Amino acid sequence: MEKLLWCLLIMISFSRTFGHEDMFKKAFVFPKESDTSYVSLEAESKKPLNTFTVCLHFYTALSTVRSFSVFSYATKKNSNDILIFWNKDKQYTFGVGGAEVRFMVSEIPEAPTHICASWESATGIVEFWIDGKPKVRKSLHKGYTVGPDASIILGQEQDSYGGDFDAKQSLVGDIGDVNMWDFVLSPEQISTVYVGGTLSPNVLNWRALNYKAQGDVFIKPQLWS
């Protein structure tokens, strides 16, 4: 009997953390500062990227307190192959291949925030959207290729592939609606995603998410519509 219960517990744990789960209207909650709590995402496609778009929601009270990681995509050749990072001086850092550009914001909203970031290698053009509104386009790492077999982490910034976390860069708050495509979304498509559309994401799909949660991470209903 004990052996049967143990097997059932293993099966439940496995399906919860490694299966493709529909996360519709759900969010990952990181309730406290930590260097051990994070969510690892497994991409549907593990190929190199010459174009991509990442969109997500996050909600935190840290924005005026300290900097923190929003999205960390490390490869074996570069721990910051794709990085979205909030700086407490009212700037988002967007990085590709270790190179970075920054986007200033005029005010810090005390509300859930939706962001989309896209990049294409052929031109180096970066687009960064906050709550459905675009910032001025910038140029970054023209001709670069993002590496394959990524380690994708929510809640922490990777200083090495899959690790070397710093609690002072951790997210405290909620994150959800994390979707990623291997192409640049058009302005019309960004608007669709902002109001809740998904457009069949083919790298990370929030409606069929393959993830593993580690530490104090909880799944709760989203606090945004």
From Swiss-Prot:
One of its GO terms (biological process) is positive regulation of superoxide anion generation. Ca(2+) 1 binds at residues 80, 157-159. Binds 2 calcium ions per subunit. It is found in: Secreted. Coiled coil: none annotated. Pfam families: Pentaxin (PF00354). Its main location: secreted. This is C-reactive protein. GO terms for cellular component: extracellular space. The keyword Signal applies. Residues 1-19 form the signal peptide. InterPro entries: ConA-like_dom_sf (IPR013320), Pentaxin_CS (IPR030476), Pentraxin-related (IPR001759), Pentraxin_domain (IPR051005). Its cofactor is Ca(2+). It comes from Mus musculus. Induction: The concentration of CRP in plasma increases greatly during acute phase response to tissue injury, infection or other inflammatory stimuli. Homopentamer. Pentraxin (or pentaxin) have a discoid arrangement of 5 non-covalently bound subunits. Interacts with FCN1; may regulate monocyte activation by FCN1. The gene is Crp. Residues 24-225 form the Pentraxin (PTX) domain. Belongs to the pentraxin family. Displays several functions associated with host defense: it promotes agglutination, bacterial capsular swelling, phagocytosis and complement fixation through its calcium-dependent binding to phosphorylcholine. Can interact with DNA and histones and may scavenge nuclear material released from damaged circulating cells. Found in plasma. GO terms for molecular function: calcium ion binding; complement component C1q complex binding; identical protein binding; low-density lipoprotein particle binding; low-density lipoprotein particle receptor binding. Disulfide bonds join 55-116. Keywords: Acute phase, Calcium, Disulfide bond, Metal-binding, Secreted, Signal. CDD domains: PTX. Ca(2+) 2 binds at residues 157, 159, 169.
